């Protein structure tokens, strides 16, 4: 007897938005009204090519009726996060699980290792000498640089075979000069995540204590400088400068990638999970009323952020994860209304543990982004004056409305980089934008004086 279409394709749902630390038992509790096939074995988590959780999973159920029950859980919450549930099938599940994760065909046995702790100015010749006797493929070395063109102290090396790469791993903790070198198994996919720098970092850098506005990197400019140009050309010390050969693709199941082969669904999920990549946060708001946080303690949890905004009640918290799997110190917080997001800005420059936290508003009144009630805004500013370290200043002007510039000079580049400097007024007025730039510049000059 032939199986029905449902029988051949199985009874599967796909879950998105899971907490990073979520376990199979927690997924089973979330679907407690549904019969999951084979218990915890029926929960199939999706991992990135670096082996980190993607926040997604497939769940195998026992019948079509169980699938219908599971779909009713769409947009319900797990902890403080709402979870999306989609109908899927066994074909999609098998394909995705095969082509993702650290053991996928795209990452296994490609002979890559990653070095960390290289001396400043370490050359390719020194690395070749370090691996003397182990064959490195032609043009098989990549030396990443940061967004200012400086060496990161890391390198990626591709050997002629996986067996040679295993031998290279045995040199872990040996020295180059006075520095001991850490060596880790890597993959072509990891090289790609380092190949093109995060756009958010290229367009906005928090000034250092000795920085001065100048050519290519002023506080109020978006100058790109030599570091940007080196990275734009793929100048990672040579190496894999021709990654256009690995053109972007979309597999039809939502696992798209850019032209460097980086996953667009993860990200730094994070990173974009960059961020945590992705040319900025991968956070997608459902209400359009968000506050971006910067300067969080690296051990801050979602609960810490909920408590930080108490008595306000955020709908969702998304802590950014960088491409190295570490938190970036930034997060996006979603509120139900524009008024709640505005009220949350009263916490700008407040401390969380030992660090003060900067807040950037990303919300407009109404769906059309029309002008907000200025009497309310002025009342809010007056009620919070002095408490926020002067982060707002007197910037209700021109077509920009209110722009939340930060207190260290108000870099206007934030308004271009990640969209966190949005105002309440219509932002199509370039004259208003220019006026904000001019005021920021004059404010900064007066601060220097």
UniProtKB/Swiss-Prot annotation:
SUPFAM superfamilies named among the record's database cross-references: RNA-binding domain, RBD (SSF54928)
Omega-N-methylarginine: modified positions: 233
UniProt crosslink position (Glycyl lysine isopeptide (Lys-Gly) (interchain with G-Cter in SUMO2)): 35, 87, 98
Cross-referenced InterPro entries: ESRP, Nucleotide-bd_a/b_plait_sf, RBD_domain_sf, RRM_dom, Znf_CHHC
Occurrences of domain RRM (ranges): 11-90, 111-188, 289-364
Pfam families hit by this protein: RRM_1, zf-RNPHF
Predominant subcellular localization, coarse grouping: nucleus
GO function term, MF aspect, one: RNA binding
Modified residues (Dimethylated arginine): 233
Keyword check for Cytoplasm: no
Region span, 2 X 16 AA Gly-rich approximate repeats: 234-433
Keywords: Acetylation, Isopeptide bond, Methylation, Nucleus, Phosphoprotein, Repeat, Ribonucleoprotein, RNA-binding, Ubl conjugation
Modified residues (N-acetylmethionine): 1-2
GO cellular component, one term: ribonucleoprotein complex
Modified residues (Phosphoserine): 23, 54, 63, 90, 310
2 X 19 AA perfect repeats, as annotated region: 354-392
Gene Ontology terms: biological process: regulation of RNA splicing
Assembly information from the UniProt record: Component of a ribonucleoprotein complex containing mRNAs and RNA-binding proteins including DDX5, HNRNPH2 and SRSF1 as well as splicing regulator ARVCF. Interacts with TXNL4/DIM1.
Function: This protein is a component of the heterogeneous nuclear ribonucleoprotein (hnRNP) complexes which provide the substrate for the processing events that pre-mRNAs undergo before becoming functional, translatable mRNAs in the cytoplasm. Binds poly(RG).
PANTHER family: HETEROGENEOUS NUCLEAR RIBONUCLEOPROTEIN-RELATED (PTHR13976)
The protein, known as: Heterogeneous nuclear ribonucleoprotein H2
The encoding gene: Hnrnph2
